[in-house]
Amino acid sequence: MNFKKTVVSALSISALALSVSGVASAHEINSTPTEVKNISISPTHVIKIQDYNLPLKVGETYSVKNNSATRYWTDNQKVAEVDQNGLVTAKSKGKATITLFKGTAVFGKVYVTVY
């Protein structure tokens, strides 16, 4: 086999072209920067984080369901419970924070006050 090595330098990047057939080729490209005058991005899905206060009486229920949330968690089950569908049940007087998750990320929080 006839190996032919050709060093090509383009735009301060050196490339080694190794040709088995004995023919090496290189193509130089123009890297002149282009200024962007106007850009618009339209997301196909906007994530809305819900952070709000929720006053409840003992025994009341309220749905904090969000279709993008994958899991719900309460920091105080004695005050407010939440099920896998986002239904909050007020258990006793006090405060609790319901955290909504999307995967492992915090999606939003609902601050429950039971009176």
From Swiss-Prot:
Domain of life of the source: Bacteria
Entry keyword annotation includes Signal: yes
InterPro entries: Big_2 (IPR003343), Invasin/intimin_cell_adhesion (IPR008964)
Induction: Expression is induced in response to phosphate starvation in a PhoR-dependent manner.
UniProt signal peptide: 1-26
Keyword Signal recorded: yes
Domain BIG2: 36-114
Transmembrane segments: none
Keywords: Signal
Pfam families membership: Big_2
Protein name (database record): Uncharacterized protein YjdB
Organism, scientific name: Bacillus subtilis (strain 168)
